[in-house]
Amino acid sequence: PRFAEKGEEGQEKKLVLELKLIADVGLVGIPNAGKSSLLKAISNANPRIEGYPFTTLSPNLGILAVDDQRIVVADVPGLIEGASENKGLGIYFLRHVERTRVLIHVLDLAATNSLDQIIRQWEIVREEFAAYNENLLERPYIVVGNKIDLLDDEAIRVGLSDYMKIQQVPLIFTSALTGEGIDGLIGMIVDTVRDYPRPQGSTKLVSPTQ
């Protein structure tokens, strides 16, 4: 240009950005409950899977494709007691749960032979949700009793079913290893997501391959 002015002094700001994943469904539970294996079983994701806690240190995303639906599923790293106080990086993980519409609470049936301890897995995560953001308790839930192939005590299965009926939360038993219950879980996810659509004007999510 033939004419230019010096202009005004610019502004400088330092910003701290907080990342929160947006997903239709979030898989939550204690460490080593089998969430990553379930994600692999129901979606196109291929997360790292190991036989020890805290294998997943950041959320994994997968796309569950059913007919013309594309449902984004997030595998949230395991939550422990004190997560709401940032134990085990809990606050970092809980932030991602806030942006999900439906929560799937995965219980590890192989972790103990005690029904009370399995129920305690449910209570721990619920308590941390309540301490962090009570609105999380109002989300639609599906409870998954995972690793059913390793459960020998039928009384635990019956007792957990009775307990979840009292809680008025749908329960399904699955095995990511053998495939038991996986089709049923997918059906429950599709139905629940359909009943709780995204708010109008929200971001449209598409498969990375589209």
List each model region and its residues:
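Conserved G1/Walker A P-loop phosphate-binding module
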Residues: 1-87, 91, 95-102
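C-terminal-of-GTPase-core extension/linker across diverse P-loop GTPases
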Residues: 3-4, 10-33, 39, 67, ...
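Generic enzyme active-site microenvironment
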Residues: 73, 106, 144
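Inter-motif core of Ras-like GTPase G domains
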Residues: 88-113, 129-136
